[in-house]
């Protein structure tokens, strides 16, 4: 098994070096990633723009998914830092949920690694469609959550309590999805946390960010070790999405979030349709 993994790594790395994208492709990816970063900053859903773009530029589906995961992972730190204070008092929750997140992310990454390219490409339209539906439902779900959550310390998670076995299993399942594809995992986590009994929306966002960092991080490491990452594209995407999140978001914030959500939903539906008819 180790020899097979080593051969796959060397073969994939060599193929990736021969498949270095052109300057025009890199420029396109940088621009799309910047827009995706801005969308993530104000509404989420940037993956629904960047992932189909990589496919449209000829990047294999599995490599596109792996590259996106690696490229977008550093941005998770910024989100986590913004909510780090909200984890005060729920360190036990964070520590316990991190374990199934890591295991789930590893399982999801492993599942992707053993999925043949043809089969993954066949289910990609459904993954994009499902993620688009999750994104479209984000507004109603967040309104439902806000109606049942609070932002004050009185409604913080009890310090003495820990997640139940059912909660850990639920987070493991979210981690598997996050490691395998991941788009829309954030809104799924918020819903799961609410069902777990958490009522402080800021704490829920903090837990969402740290757990996303866990399952995306271990998945990214797995993809990198197995040689599935197109590093020139990953670097350009990381720079572009970071720039978009910090600069373009200032401009995009002048646009109502509802407009951005409708646009991303339309892009997701169009991408799913295109992926279905073009494969």
Please place each PLM-identified region on the residue numbering:
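Alpha-helical transmembrane segments of multipass membrane proteins
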Residues: 34-38, 53, 80, 106-110, ...
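Selective hydrophobic functional segments
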Residues: 67-126, 216-263
């Amino acid at each position: 098994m180790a020899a097979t993994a080593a051969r796959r790594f060397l073969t994939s790395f060599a193929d990736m070096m021969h498949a270095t994208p052109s300057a025009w492709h890199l420029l396109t990816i940088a621009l799309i990633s910047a827009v995706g970063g801005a969308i993530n900053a104000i509404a989420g859903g940037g993956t629904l723009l960047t992932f189909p773009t990589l496919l449209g530029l000829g990047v294999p589906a599995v490599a596109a998914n792996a590259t996106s995961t690696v490229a977008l992972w550093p941005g998770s730190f910024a989100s986590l830092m913004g909510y780090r204070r909200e984890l005060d008092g729920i360190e036990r929750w964070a520590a316990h949920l991190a374990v199934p997140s890591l295991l789930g992310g590893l399982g999801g990454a492993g599942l992707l690694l053993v999925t043949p390219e043809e089969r993954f490409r066949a289910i990609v339209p459904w993954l994009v469609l499902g993620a688009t539906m999750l994104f479209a439902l984000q507004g109603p779900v967040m309104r439902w959550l806000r109606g049942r959550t609070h932002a004050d310390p009185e409604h913080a998670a009890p310090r003495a309590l820990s997640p139940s076995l059912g909660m850990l299993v639920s987070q493991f399942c979210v981690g598997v999805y996050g490691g395998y594809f991941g788009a829309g995992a954030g809104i799924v986590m918020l819903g799961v946390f609410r069902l777990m009994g958490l009522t402080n929306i800021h704490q829920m966002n903090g837990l969402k960010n740290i757990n996303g960092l866990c399952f995306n991080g271990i998945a990214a490491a797995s993809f990198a070790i197995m040689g599935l990452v197109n590093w020139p594209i990953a670097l350009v995407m990381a720079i572009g999405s970071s720039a978009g999140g910090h600069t373009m978001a200032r401009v995009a914030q002048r646009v109502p979030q509802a407009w951005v959500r409708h646009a991303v939903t339309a892009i997701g539906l169009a991408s799913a349709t295109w992926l279905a008819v073009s494969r």
